[in-house]
Amino acid sequence: MADSATLDATTVQVLQDLANRLRVHSIRATCASGSGHPTSCCSAAEIVSVLFFHTMRYRQTEPAHPDNDRFVLSKGHAAPLLYAAWVEAGSISEPDLLNLRTIHCDLEGHPTPRLSFVDVATGSLGQGLGAACGMAYTGKYLDKASYRVFCLLGDGESSEGSVWEALAFASHYGLDNLVAVFDVNRLGQSGVAPLKHCTDIYRNRCEAFGWNTYLVDGHDVEALCQAFSQAAQGKNKPTAIIAKTYKGRGIPNVEDAENWHGKPLPKERADEIIRLIKSQIKTNRNLLPKPPVEGSPPVSITNIKMTCLPDYKVGDKVATQKAYGLALAKLGLANERVVVLDGDPKNSTFFEIFKKEHPERFIECFAAEQNMVSVALGCATRGRTITFVTTLGAFLTRAFDQIRMGAISQSNINLIGSHCGVSVGEDGPSQMALEDLAMFRSIPNCTVFLPSDAVSTEHAVYLAANSEGMCFIRTNRSETAVIYTPQEHFEIGRAKVIRHSNNDKVTVIGAGVTLHEALAAADALSQQDISICVIDPFTIKPLDAATIISCAKATDGRVVTVEDHYQEGGIGEAVCAAVSGEPAIHVHQLSVSGVSERNRKPSELLSIFGVSARHIIAAVKYTLMN
């Protein structure tokens, strides 16, 4: 491969020819599928040609090698262009490319990690750069390796605020191994992008965010090579390349024309245009990428053991969010690849304990939750880290799309929500996570933990660290009593029956603070000669349906659920779904019924919303009378 400083005419021609071959592949594939975005592919053909066959270092036969340079296609609708590059690199056959978007083909309309050369799923715009930031941060500060990260964005998606959160993050951490390429083709999906072709405005904005910035003609391969070469020389700043391009480049009467987004060319026109583009190809040569510079350290992130048992005594009063902070610090001792990302509330959520003990593995993302989740997804790619994302549970709702895309990315990130439920008290409704269980229960392959004391919280942290797929741990601000001994064993999907006798009349299921309300209710009811079974589900997803059904049948089908969460999507609905095949089981649900309008103490709010011990007692008596 020629160096950009001595780029010869032959190399320039080969790169231009490769760009045109990428156009041909993209047009053919989208025509074959009858759907797709050929015009979005054509605008970035030269960019991808230069990246894959001149600038990036990688092993073609090992796309996921840890030392390879990374590429993130943030404008995921241009997936055929990415697949075309891998056709030219020899990893995909041309016939396979023609199966684009078919049910048995991994070449989807937007890229996902079902493909070995895709690290994160994209397609929901504005998220690729945040993931690229996570990869670059891992490379620079954790792996201390030579690999670089390139992210291709569309101009339309740069309207997303998450893009600018990522720009701020990369600048703050001096990610000089990161290059963002803005494909400024002027057109969005349904019309003109807000900044049109005003590349100077893009430059000014990127520079204001602390990036080295270069303006280039995005269809000039020589200029692109030079810009990428300059980016490689930059120190302590990320680089933005603002590439002026034209949507549908090379397609007569379509180039720079509106109303062609997401439309394949009619077959008769496509054949003619392919012949035209092919006539401009002067060589049949290819360029091989340079091999990567090896240097990424070997990592092991499986089978992590507790360094010691939880250090709590039954009866100790500890908030589960504090127990989580302490457990995470212990986990950091057990494995040096544990990384924590914080959204700024570390001083009130006990995440600063981890920062104090493992500062080199604590990533402050500030109040930018969307970017924080995207960065975490990037950090976790290629099995480089065990990643925990920490903030108030209410604020994770802002990042739901990033979390959703994380599931599509088959990511193993762990998210922890603190200050959950009305038990936050005087801070008011804006701080109360009351939708979080519904949100995370809806995420495929996501394990949802709801620990009820410090011991179970510590076990939840270790189980999450060793789990495949995404995990969510819900924690509370209120101090609650430790109810389990340090020797207690916990499993995902296995509930704990806390109170049980042969005379139980009703099964009561609570979790977190409401489990303690249920235990208080059980004590009060026992004074009235009414015995109840009390279950701690531990994980809300998967739910231990077998234990719940068994206990419910033993109490003549009478079940009461109580939760510090809205009814929709919460514990009650999860239990109803679990027992839906058992017509003799009837579930009475207690849950938060509305938004708190007043500042009250946690105990007062639990009572106001009908999820206190007093209301559990009333519900038990009601079920016994009906």
Swiss-Prot record:
What does the note under cofactor report?
Answer: Binds 1 Mg(2+) ion per subunit. Can also utilize other divalent metal cations, such as Ca(2+), Mn(2+) and Co(2+). Binds 1 thiamine pyrophosphate per subunit.
The coiled-coil segments of this chain are none
Where Mg(2+) binds, per the record, is at 155, 185, 187
Q: Which CDD domains match?
A: TPP_PYR_DXS_TK_like (cd07033), TPP_TK (cd02012)
Cofactor entry: Mg(2+); Ca(2+); Mn(2+); Co(2+)
Q: Which family does it belong to?
A: Belongs to the transketolase family.
Q: What is this protein called?
A: Transketolase-like protein 2
The scientific name of the source species is Bos taurus (Bovine)
Q: What is the lineage of its organism?
A: Eukaryota, Metazoa, Chordata, Craniata, Vertebrata
Q: What's the gene?
A: TKTL2
